[in-house]
Amino acid sequence: MTAPNEKLADSLAALQVLQKGGQRVFQSKDLDRLHRERLLRNGFVQEVMKGWLISSSPSAREGDSTPWYASFWEFCARYCQERFGDDWHLSPEQSLLLHAENTVIPTQVVIYTPRGTNNVVKLLSGTSIYDLKQPDMPPAADVVVRDGLRLYSPAAALVKVPEAFFNRYPIESQVALTSIGDPSDVLRRLLDGGHSVVAGRLAGAFRRIGRPEVADEIVAAMKGADFTVRETDPFAAQQTFGTLRPATAPIVGRMQAMWQAMREPVMAVFPKMPGLPKDRGEYLKFVDEIYKSDAYHSLSIEGYSVTPELIDRVRAGGWDPDHHDDDRKNRDALAARGYWQAFQAVKASVSEIIAGANPGTLTRGAHRDWYRELFQPCVAAGLLRAGALAGYRNDAVYLRTSRYVPPRWEAVRDAMPALFDLMEHENEPGVRAVLGHWMFGYIHPYPDGNGRMARFLMNAMLASGGYPWTVVRVEDRNGYLSALDSASIDLNIEPFAKFIAERVQWSMKHQGDAAKNAGRA
């Protein structure tokens, strides 16, 4: 008789065949009944709806949306292809959001298709697909395929989206408008369709974001074809725009637009800058003193079980993986040792920053050293391959339970230099600290350690204004993560800015008290 573990191994082997190439979505018919039931029972797959499965993990908690969000767009692509063949595409609104690197999982995806039934298909975690019946498919030139999803091209989508889109999604609209290098693609569709009202709207939009030459070209071409055009501005009056260079990579344009939009809300709540410390030794002494608290809270936020005693042992050099198996194998001890090593590297960077180095320029290279120190103990212990220290991720990552999905790994190579450009040219240390922290997590450039790295970066940026090293406490974890989610999903930075500002104010008071006590001594 075959043992249960052998049966499960056979089922996992069948699943592995289907997962080749990174596939996470399958039809039930792809697995025979016994394999399917066994994998469902053991949590290795999850049912989305009748006939469809996604890869899951036995360790996923009940109600955990992470496996679903990780599979969402692949499911949409495979389900629609199976049901509609090539006769479908996403709505112009969703197409533009994806072109503008808005990676938030929507609660509902609208599919345009001649084979639609105007029905809602309910999916997991409160999401759904709505198949909107359309008389015809758009011209082939209007549709592009990306990761299996059939999207309107940016030019076609801009002509199709309603005026309300520009008001609701100003950042995505600016990124999409900026992606249009030459206006010919947009003009051709406006002229062929006789879209004089849309032409006026797009002319107003291009002029508002700082591209008057495109606006003038649209108006002149439409009038030359005997259309009456009245230019209108579709954006809200209070919306402000920085200048983006045409044909900028969408992720870079998005980051620049978000940074510009979020600067003022951060400055409105952040405490006054103390200025670079006169006594750099005293500043660094405070950094040393706060290490124990910082390590405990930062590691605990990430789910490590780290005690103050373990932190003290690591700091005192009592961690010895060469002679103690427990130290070599203990995940928490390895994390604590890596944090100690990285903290020393960050402190060295802070020392240069308070001496006057440009923090954006310095951390552009130094953050790679921090990361290597953070995970070097895990590599030395054999828990990670040496390649883990190579640099940025080359695969997708997902945030547990969050509808926000970090950018595609291909976009990280453009995003990270852009982040350091923004910090390099930013004059306000508080803005560098808050937006640097949030945007590092938004990009999520590494396979692991992004939260710790973001907090290190925040403290390096705080140092550039003379603010003290600031600890995010584990007891504030839920509010902290909720504020980050609000910024990433709703582009509302205010909760996160207020959260960090309050922690910085506490740290300033604590540093001041420590200085007074030292003076009495």
Where do the language-model regions lie?
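FIC/Doc superfamily catalytic core
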Residues: 1-33, 40-50, 56, 60-521
